[in-house]
C-alpha cells in the first residue's frame, strides 16, 4: 500500500473506494495497474487535497516488480514482509534479504530507498491476526514526485 501520515492520521490507497484496477497479460507478465487516491478510513483526502496514486505490479515466474509513479506529498510504499524471529534479515538502503528455510527472499530497490518503520526489539512487528511477525519495510522516494521501483524474487 501507499501511505501518508499527516497530523496523526493515516491516508492510504487501500481505503479508496473509487480505485480503478486493470489487469492484462503482456510478454509473459501478468500486469496490474492500480489508480487510486490517498484517503483516510472516512474517504477524506489530506488537507492539501486529492493525492493521486498509480501503482503498477508485474508478476512473472521470477518474481514481482512494484512501481509507484509520482509518489507525492511525503507518501511512501509500505511493504510488510513476513519474517519470523528465527529468520535472518539484512536490510540496507537498496536491498533487503530474508533467509527462509528453502532459499532467500530478495527485495531490491531501483528507485527510492528502503527504510524500516519502528519495530519490536527483534526488528519485527507481531500481528496477532493472522499470527505472523513481519519486517515493516517502507520504500521512500528520493524526493517528492519521484518514482519508487522495487523487485521481489526468491532464490
What are the roles of these predicted feature ranges?
Residues 1, 6, 91, 100-102, ...:
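Compact beta-rich and alpha/beta scaffold cores in large eukaryotic transport/transcription complexes
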Residues 1-73:
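Catalytic and substrate-binding regions of extracellular carbohydrate-active enzymes
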Residues 7-9, 37-41, 60, 71-73, ...:
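Generic structural motif
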Residues 51, 62-101:
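Acidic (Asp/Glu-rich), glycine- and aromatic
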Residues 80, 101, 108-155:
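Beta-strand-rich recognition/accessory modules
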